[in-house]
Amino acid sequence: TADGIDSTDPGRPDRLVARAGVASPGDVADAVDRATRAQPAWARRPPQERAEALRRAANLLRAERHTLAALQVRECGKPWAEADADVCEAIDHIEYAVHQALSLADGKPLLQLPGERNQLRYRPRGVVAAIGPWNFPLAIPAGLVATGLATGNAVILKPAEQAPASGHRLVQALRRGGVPDDIIQLLPGYGETGAALVAHPGVHTIAFTGSEPVGLSIIRAAADTSHEQRHVKRVVAEMGGKNAIIVDSDADLDQVVPDVLRSAFAF
C-alpha cells in the first residue's frame, strides 16, 4: 500500500525493525471475501488434518525460538527472558488448541433420557477476526488464531501496529505448516483497520485482547447488526481486568512499587 507502518526499536527509535503496509477498507473487504469462500472447505477437512497443520506450525516456531525472541526484544522492547517465555507460550497455546479441538470433534454426551439420544456438537462459526496486543505479540495472537483454525474457522489476524513483524512470523509459520493462505490472513494497520474488520458483515466472531476502551467499542460495533448479516456476531474480549492491585495503607512502598512493575510486565 502507499501508506506504511515503520516498526522501530523502542530502545533505539532510529533503528528500523520492520516495515508493513496499512490495510485499507478495500483490503479488509477482500480478505473477508476470500476467507468466506475458503472456509467451508477447511471446515470439511478432518479435525486430525487441521490439527496436524497446527502441530507443524508449532514445531516451526519451536525451531525458530531464539530468532523470534530476538525479534520481540527489538520490536517491542521485551527483556530476553520475557521474550523467550512469550515464544514458548505461543507454542503452548497452539498445541493446547489442537488438543481441545480434537477432544470436541466427536461432540459431548448430554443427559440421556428414555427414548432420547442427546449429544452436543460444536460447529465452526465462519470467519474470525483476531485482534492482538503489542505487549505479548506472539503468545496472545497465537492463542486467538489457533483456537479458530483448529475448530474449522477462517481467521484474519490484525496485529498491534507496534508489532507487525511478530504477527507476520506467526502467519508465516501457520502457512508453512499447511494452513491455506485464505484461511489465515494478516491485515496490519492502525485502529481504522481493526474497526473496518469488526464492522464487516461477513465476520462472525471477534477475538480481542487489549485496552478497555477499544474492547467496549468492539462490543458496541458487533451489536449493530447489518441487514447484510444472517448471524449475530460473537465477541471474546479480554481487557486486562485481571490486573487489579490492592495496596494496604501499611504496605512497604519501597517493596510494593518494584513488585507491581514486575507483575505488570512479567510472567
Ranges and model annotations:
Residues 1-19:
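Hydrophobic face of amphipathic alpha-helices that form TPR/SEL1-like repeat modules
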Residues 94, 167-170, 197, 218:
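Hydrophobic packing residues within well-ordered alpha-helices of enzyme cores
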Residues 13-105:
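Glycine-rich loop-to-alpha-helix module at the N-terminal edge of alpha/beta enzyme cores
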Residues 158-160, 188, 248:
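Short beta->alpha connector loops at strand-helix junctions that form conserved
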Residues 117-118, 185-207:
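A structured beta-alpha segment of the ubiquitous adenosine-cofactor-binding alpha/beta core
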Residues 107-181, 254:
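Conserved small-residue-rich beta-alpha loop and adjacent elements
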Residues 178, 199, 213-267:
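ALDH superfamily catalytic-core signature
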